[in-house]
Amino acid sequence: MKDEQHHNQLEDDEDSGRAAAECIEIEPDFLKKLRDMTVNKNVEEMRKQRKNAVYIAGRLALAGQITVFYAAPNTGKTLIALKLISESIANGTAGENVFHINLDDTFDGLIEKADLANRHGFYELGPDRFVKPDENLRELVERLVNEDSARKAVLLLDTVKKFVDVMDKKASSNFMTICRRFTAAGGTIIALAHVNKKKNDDNEGIPAGTSDILDDCDCAYVMHALKDEIGPEGKWRTVEFLQKKARGPVVPEAIYKYHINHNDYSQMFNSVKLIEGDEVDRVRQQNAIDSEKAHDLEAIEAISSELDSSEPKTQKDILEALGQLGISRRTLIDCLKRWSCAQEDGGLWQLTRGDSNSNCYRLLD
């Protein structure tokens, strides 16, 4: 019995030895294959292909990266993106292979963008070429990567929701994997996406969908309209880009403005301009004033209805007249004080002194 056990043990030891020997023989081959998969041997070639801080859209997007612009509808994300990319084409940084994949537009809109494309050197692709956008994008990326053409191309994806269900975490992750495959081969992607209807506590847009697109991109901005104003040339919209994520020397924020003309897209396109220097401070100050006025709107409208620009009214008379509106006395007094300042600071009425040193107010001219 002992001899049989000893014999079995010897057989087990021999089997273990053979298995170990096989592992020793197999492992070096596999490790060599694994080493061959690494980028170490290609680093010099990759360095030659690397794009050193080449700006593709103003100073908001870098070549070789995935950049996402989030904005609500009618903010101007397509307009501004096309303008900035066209400037990069003109100065030679974007190359000759910029493709606007426009899946979120009307027939007339496609014609307008195609006219711009012909004038400014980019290429317009519409829904007829992307019947199944997710599959078509994957096929396009695979073809460009396999032909070593990705590094020569810029893709403007308009909009992300046409390529993927942004509420589907797995689908969003797969979409970003496709985008990463493209940029890992040297390509550049600028993707336009939407924000939720509900804003955050700072009144800023919240990227729509799961976090995967924001998590997996290189750079992202949330755009929001600061204000619309009427000037000698018509209505102008001012838009701010606020950075949510960055890899590389892109700006943390930027402000652009454009002339709103729904009858002439090319005129709107040509009007887009960057706001710089002192004008940035003025825009930010005005935006802060507008935000405060929006908070005080009910009280401002009530007080304004009681005042005129000729005869001042005492604070006591104003409060008595507005006493039945349901606005608290403290809110009205604070509003009277807050907006009795110079017009350049947002002032709405003038404070003067009446009998017995009483506070009197009249509308500013």
Question: Where are the model-predicted features located?
Answer:
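C-terminal regions of RecA-like/P-loop NTPase motor modules
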Residues: 2-35, 148-151, 229-365
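The Walker A/P-loop phosphate-binding site
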Residues: 23-117
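Conserved inter-motif catalytic segment of the P-loop NTP-binding fold
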Residues: 57, 93-173
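Structured loop/turn residues at beta-strand edges in well-structured enzyme cores
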Residues: 64, 96, 150-151, 184-185, ...
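Generic beta-sheet signal
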Residues: 67-69, 98, 153-157, 189, ...
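Phosphate-binding/switch region of NTP-binding enzymes
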Residues: 68-70, 74, 79, 173-268
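Conserved, well-folded catalytic cores of nucleic-acid-processing
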Residues: 87-91, 117, 163, 182, ...
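Helical mechanochemical/support elements of P-loop NTPase systems and associated helical scaffolds
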Residues: 106, 110, 136, 171-178, ...
